[in-house]
Design a protein with these regions (language model features):
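Structural preference for beta-strand elements that scaffold enzyme active sites
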Residues: 16-20, 45-47, 89-93, 108, ...
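Glycine-rich, proline-tolerant flexible connector loops at the mouths of alpha/beta enzymes
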Residues: 45-62
Length: 161
């Protein structure tokens, strides 16, 4: 089990909240500000992805901006003896729409199977296509089954669920 998986499964730290930031919805700088706000509000994992309207460059720029902001806040907190310096420990994990939206800067990737998709691309195709990149970049894969219960939304339409 990798660092991100261990972090997710560690019961000693209690309940955690994760926020999903879609790179297509804002600039990387705005995404970084939203991630910082979420971290200050108690989120303990940042998921990046989920959109059909983004590409590898946008995802990468967003993850880099978020990680730089979290590291800067963590460093600043380390200079203040009264502050808690844990923002740099928040993992930034890919929640990709597919193999065309990956980044080597991520701490991990939700390697997911859309379990009720009628399209083999979302059952195994995207995973097979993205696996060489994930391995080469050293990104920790986090296995995940994804089930869409009401296929009226965009994810259900795109994933043919």
């Amino acid at each position: 089990m990798g660092v991100v998986s261990e972090y997710m499964c560690d019961r000693t730290t209690g309940t955690r909240h994760a926020i999903l930031i879609d790179p297509a919805d804002q600039t990387p700088e705005v995404a970084a500000n939203r991630a910082l706000a979420a971290a200050h509000a108690g989120s303990r994992m940042i998921l990046v992805g989920g959109s059909t309207g983004t590409d590898m460059d946008n995802v990468h720029a967003t993850i880099v901006a978020i990680k730089e902001s979290l590291e800067l806040v963590s460093w600043a907190a380390s200079q203040d003896s009264d502050a808690v310096a844990d923002s740099g420990q928040i993992p930034v994990v890919l929640f990709p729409q597919g193999a065309a939206a990956l980044s080597p800067a991520a701490d991990g990737i939700t390697f997911m199977v859309l379990m009720n998709s009628m399209d083999q691309r979302f059952l195994i195709g995207e995973q097979v296509e993205g696996a060489p990149f994930v391995k080469k970049a050293g990104i920790e894969p986090v296995p995940m089954g994804y089930l869409i219960c009401e296929p009226g939304g965009k994810a259900g339409q795109v994933g043919n669920a």
